[in-house]
Structure formats: C-alpha cells, structure tokens
Regions:
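Intrinsically disordered, low-complexity N-terminal extensions of AAA+/P-loop NTPases
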Residues: 1-215, 222, 234-298
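Short acidic alpha-helix initiation/capping motifs at coil-to-helix transition points
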Residues: 52-60, 343, 357-359, 375
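Conserved lysine of the Walker
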Residues: 227
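Conserved AAA+ ATPase small/helical "lid" subdomain
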Residues: 348-351, 355-375
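Conserved catalytic/switch belt of AAA+ P-loop NTPases
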Residues: 283-335
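Hydrophobic/aromatic beta-strand patches that form the interior of the parallel beta-sheet core
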Residues: 217, 243, 316, 335-337
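Conserved AAA+ ATPase "SRH/arginine-finger" region at the nucleotide-binding site
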Residues: 319, 334-354
C-alpha cells in the first residue's frame, strides 16, 4: 500500500527502512518492482544466520518479563511486537498501512499471520481478562480502527526503559506499589478499639499460617482516625512487608480506578508467596460511581467479586466512606471496621509529642478537638 501513491511513496521513512532506493519511485511499474525487491530481500533474510534482533538487551528484558509474569508464547510474541511498535514509529506507521480501518476480527487475523500463530490463541491472548490487558501491559483504543488502535502500549511499563535498562522485578514492583511508611503511632494508641484491633490481627495471623486466599479487611471512617497508620501497625505486629498501592504515578499525576485495578492484579502476582500485606488506600477512586458513569469496580463487577475471593496476598482496603460501595462488594470483605476517632486525650498527647512541648495547654486542647487533624 505504501507504494500506491501516484507520485511516489506514501512514506519515505518506511521505504528507507525496507531498503528501497529512491530511484524506484520513478519507474513506471513501481509496485511490481517493489514487490520483486522485497521478495528477494525477505528470501535473503530468511536464509541468513543473523539473530532475531540486534537489540540484545531488549530481547533479554522481554524474555525475563514474560518468564516472571508467566506469559505463554503467544502473549510473549504479541508483547514483543507491541514493544517494537512503541519504540519504532516507522514500524507502527507501516503496520497501520497494512491494517487501516479494520475491525477487531480482521486485526486478529492479520496478527495471527504476522506471528504465525493460531487465530484463536491470538484472540484469547488479547481478551480483557488475560494478562496482557489485565496487567495494563497493553490496552485498546476503543475509538480507533487502525492496527495500532488494537495494540496500544499500556501504562504499566516504560517501553523505552526496556531498551536501555536491565529488567528487574524490583523496578516493576515500584511501578505499581510503594513500601508503606512506618507507623507514627503505637499499638497502644488504638486502645479505644482494642478488641476489634486484636481480632483483625489474629485473623490475619491465622490467614498467613494457613495460606488462606481471599483475605480482605475494609477499614473506613473519617480522615484523621488513623486508618492508614493502623494498617502499617498490623504489618509490623505480624512481621510483614507492607506495600501501598499508589493513587498517583511517577510524575505525581493522579491515576484512575481502572489502572489501579490493573496495578493491584500485577502486585498480587509479584508478591504472591511472600509475607506481605497490600494496602489499597482511597478506594473511593475504584468503587464510587457518578450520575453518568459506572465506577471501575461496577464496570468489572464479576471480576472484582472473584478477586475478593481469590487474592493470594492479604489486603487492607481503606476508605473514608462506604456509602459509595455496593452492598454486594461489602459482603465480600472478611471484616469491615468503622474506625472511631482517636480520643481527645490521645490526640492531645500526640500533639504534645510532635510539638516538642512548644505549644500551650490551650493550643494543644484546641488542636486535639479538630476532627480533621490526622495522626
């Protein structure tokens, strides 16, 4: 298609990448000559002993990533093509010339031919519930119908970094979670809810001993009641590594509920088998619907329900309000705790501790009465 223009190439970049001389543009039977030249070039490439790629590091990283996430061969081949499309605009342009204004079925057929893989396996690998889409490695532009609209690069990984930095699981984990900050409160600071706190701690302890799946605790309550601190304390009490799912990316831009659901799935895969506790703060981003749009959780209701029954790494979910959550979701949590406000006496002691006795008794008392004052 790129040589069908009456005045020459549709794309000089593609012609150059294919090794076609500019003189061919002036030939009367240009399409016929181009087909012959490309056929010969393809034959020589197939016969050569050249390796699949000059990008050794990139190939190693793709293989390591596929192995860690247990991608099957078809998924790995699709991911590999998507990486090269992302870092090579000329390749993307060429593929769009081949697949322009096509439906999804035609796209899958083209991809199956390119990768020499069964159509059914290609279609299955690109399903929303499979790893490539589920982990946010790839995504689909629902408003376009060109080749690259069906094979968009996702938000989880930086394709350019795969080409210049060795892959590490630690780097991948940092893309979706951060180590939780050490708690600034002590276990004794939650004496006002001691019975429930001990119940949750003991329940989690038993869950780790028995390797139980589908363990989820929901903490909710007004800001300043110590929900996040309590989650960190639970991890400390049980000698667990604690990780928090971020609500912002590396550039401090807020990320949406759909991407956060992708991140939690990837984090579960990476942390499976470890003594870890996963904290999902500000879950309103995922569960809250608006008048005109369903929440990310409502849009994937069956999946969320299944996730809450089978997640391998125990989780603490934190919200200021559960009024936005469907009752069907609430019933899936093992324990739901409404976190009461810290007693004023306890708040006053914390204020004095943080202020290093530089405030008067009246100032301390005033601050302790502020419900929005966080620990």
């Amino acid at each position: 298609r790129f040589c069908g223009h009456r005045h020459g190439w549709f794309s000089d970049e593609i012609a150059s990448a294919l090794g076609l001389p500019s003189e061919v543009e002036q030939v009367d039977e240009m399409p016929k000559m181009v087909k012959a030249l490309l056929g010969e070039r393809y034959r020589l490439l197939k016969q050569s002993a050249r390796s699949d790629s000059e990008r050794v590091l990139l190939e190693q990283n793709i293989a390591a990533l596929a192995e860690r996430l247990q991608l099957n061969r078809v998924e790995m081949l699709i991911l590999r093509l998507a990486v090269y499309m992302q870092i090579d605009p000329t390749l993307k342009e060429a593929l769009n010339l081949i697949g322009r204004q096509i439906d999804r079925r035609r796209f899958c057929h083209l991809l199956a031919e390119m990768l020499n893989q069964p159509f059914a396996e290609i279609r299955a690998a690109l399903h929303d519930k499979q790893k490539l889409m589920r982990f946010g490695l790839l995504q689909t532009n629902r408003h376009g119908r060109d080749f690259d609209d069906y094979l968009c690069w996702g938000d989880t990984l930086d394709a350019d970094k795969l080409d210049i930095q060795p892959f590490s699981e630690e780097t991948l984990l940092k893309r979706v979670v951060q180590p939780s900050m050490p708690a600034g409160l002590a276990w004794s600071d939650f004496e006002h809810t001691a019975a429930m706190a001990c119940r949750i701690r003991d329940y989690l302890h038993h869950a780790y001993q028995t390797q139980r799946k589908g363990v989820n605790i929901l903490l909710y309550g007004a800001p300043g009641t110590g929900k996040t601190e309590f989650a960190s304390l639970l991890a400390h009490q049980l000698a667990l590594s604690c990780y928090t799912l971020g609500s912002a990316d590396e550039d401090e831009d807020m990320i949406g509920g759909q991407r956060r659901l992708q991140n939690v799935q990837l984090a579960q895969t990476l942390l499976a088998g470890q003594r870890a506790l996963l904290v999902f703060d500000e879950v309103e981003d995922v569960f809250a619907s608006s008048l005109f749009q369903l929440s990310a959780a409502q849009s994937h209701k069956a999946w969320v329900n299944q996730f809450l029954e089978h997640n391998a790494v125990p989780m603490v979910w934190i919200s200021n309000d559960v009024g936005c959550m469907d009752e069907a979701f609430l019933r899936r949590f093992d324990i739901v705790l409404h976190m009461p406000d810290l007693p004023q006496q306890k708040k006053a002691a914390l204020v004095e501790q943080l202020a290093h006795q530089r405030l008067s008794e009246g100032e301390v008392a005033y601050l302790a009465k502020q419900q929005k004052l966080t620990p």
